Amino acid sequence: MLRPRVSVTVDPFTRIATVRYVGAINGDVIIPEVLRLYGALERPWEYDCIWDMRRHTGRTETRDNEALARGWQAICGGRDIGRYTAIVSDDALIGARLPLTQRLFPFRTLAVFATVEMARAWLETARADTEAPSVA
């Protein structure tokens, strides 16, 4: 049995924050903890995110996503415009909820992946596409 836990790890060089929640933990516990940990980062709006939910066996509901969106907005205040969030899950409901979740986070681009490797590859490609030098 997995010990329920929430973690946020940060790579300051790649500017990627990885959020993981593991075990039978529900959204009413996950969301406040994620917001506390993410909010403690210096300039958190400068990070792209990977949300790794592969070992999550609890439940999150639409109201949890809405609470996360409100807290996220309070922390980032729209300064995360153009950032990316890769969600890693094999739960079909996560993919089905993506259009609703995307509307809750209008400044970020969200996508769902089966593996962390696929999520990282998407982030690298998306970043390369948006960081191309402009012609003056």
Per-segment meaning from a language model:
Residues 1-136:
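Amphipathic, Lys/Arg-enriched alpha-helical "gate/interface" segment within cytosolic domains
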